[in-house]
């Protein structure tokens, strides 16, 4: 069995995802009790991209998150550093452009995409702040970024129940449905170690993104952050003004 440590060495993380690739989407549906696909639909709505626009879907894995864009006539590039995931995705959707790439050193020119997105992948990057800077670099001025990531439930009782599920129930279920249950121990540990909604918003501001908002889904189990790359003639909003800039939405979603 292969699992990554919380040091998130790229070779370990890539190997772990290679191992789980064949059943990745099915296991996700089971472990999220069917919520994963709903969360991804909300991300697509938040992206609000048009036919003919070009979108970067980073940490796209098998391309499940890329499919809605391709089906809608959007030029989507599915990028991931797990070759195993990309192979599964290319077999499923040969019409989608799958490209191997490192989130901290993207293989794209500046200002290549009208919008960028990453769902449930930023947490697995060894230098997530560098990834935010790289996505800023490859996104066109005025372009949008949408991030979906596991976060921190906002209701204390719900937070306690969720922690119990992560650390006890999830690994037990993974043993039954996954070929590499140890990978889902890493999943639980990495979620617990991930910063909360406001900290991620601060990282976005530090990276140069503006107009930052977030929305909590399922009581804060997942947060969807949205931001914009400044137009070339605009200056980034000072970090001191971030609290006034962020407009959190705490509904369960």
From Swiss-Prot:
Enzyme Commission number: 2.1.1.163
Chain residues that bind S-adenosyl-L-methionine: 62, 80, 102-103, 119
Keywords: Menaquinone biosynthesis, Methyltransferase, S-adenosyl-L-methionine, Transferase
Pfam families referenced in this protein's UniProt entry, alphabetically: Ubie_methyltran
Known pathway: Quinol/quinone metabolism; menaquinone biosynthesis; menaquinol from 1,4-dihydroxy-2-naphthoate: step 2/2
InterPro entries, sorted: SAM-dependent_MTases_sf (IPR029063), UbiE/COQ5_MeTrFase (IPR004033), UbiE/COQ5_MeTrFase_CS (IPR023576)
GO biological process per UniProt: menaquinone biosynthetic process; methylation
Enzyme superclass (EC): transferase
Catalytic activity entry: a 2-demethylmenaquinol + S-adenosyl-L-methionine = a menaquinol + S-adenosyl-L-homocysteine + H(+)
Domain of life per record: Bacteria
Cited PANTHER family: 2-METHOXY-6-POLYPRENYL-1,4-BENZOQUINOL METHYLASE, MITOCHONDRIAL (PTHR43591:SF24), METHYLTRANSFERASE (PTHR43591)
Protein family according to the UniProt entry: Belongs to the class I-like SAM-binding methyltransferase superfamily. MenG/UbiE family.
Protein name, entry field: Demethylmenaquinone methyltransferase
């Amino acid at each position: 069995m292969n699992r990554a440590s919380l040091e998130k060495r790229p070779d370990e993380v890539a190997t772990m995802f290679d191992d789980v690739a064949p059943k990745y989407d099915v296991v996700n549906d089971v472990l999220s009790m069917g919520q994963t696909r709903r969360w991804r639909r909300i991300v697509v709505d938040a992206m609000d991209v048009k036919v003919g626009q070009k979108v970067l879907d980073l940490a796209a894995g098998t391309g499940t998150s890329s499919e809605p864009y391709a089906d809608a006539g959007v030029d989507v590039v599915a990028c991931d550093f797990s070759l195993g995931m990309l192979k599964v995705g290319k077999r499923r959707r040969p019409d989608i452009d799958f490209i191997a790439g490192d989130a901290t050193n993207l293989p794209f020119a500046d200002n290549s995409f009208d919008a960028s997105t990453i769902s449930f992948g930023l947490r697995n990057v060894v230098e997530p702040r560098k990834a935010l800077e790289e996505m800023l670099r490859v996104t066109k001025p005025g372009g949008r970024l949408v991030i979906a990531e596991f976060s921190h439930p906002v209701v204390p009782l719900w937070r306690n129940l969720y922690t119990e599920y992560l650390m006890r129930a999830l690994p037990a279920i993974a043993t039954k449905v996954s070929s590499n249950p140890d990978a889902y121990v890493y999943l639980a540990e990495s979620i617990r170690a991930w910063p909360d909604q406001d900290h991620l918003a601060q990282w976005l501001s530090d990276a140069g993104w503006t107009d930052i908002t977030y929305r909590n889904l399922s009581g804060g189990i997942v947060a969807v952050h949205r931001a914009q790359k400044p137009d070339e003639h605009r200056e980034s909003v000072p970090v001191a003004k971030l609290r006034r800039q962020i407009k959190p939405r705490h509904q369960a979603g």
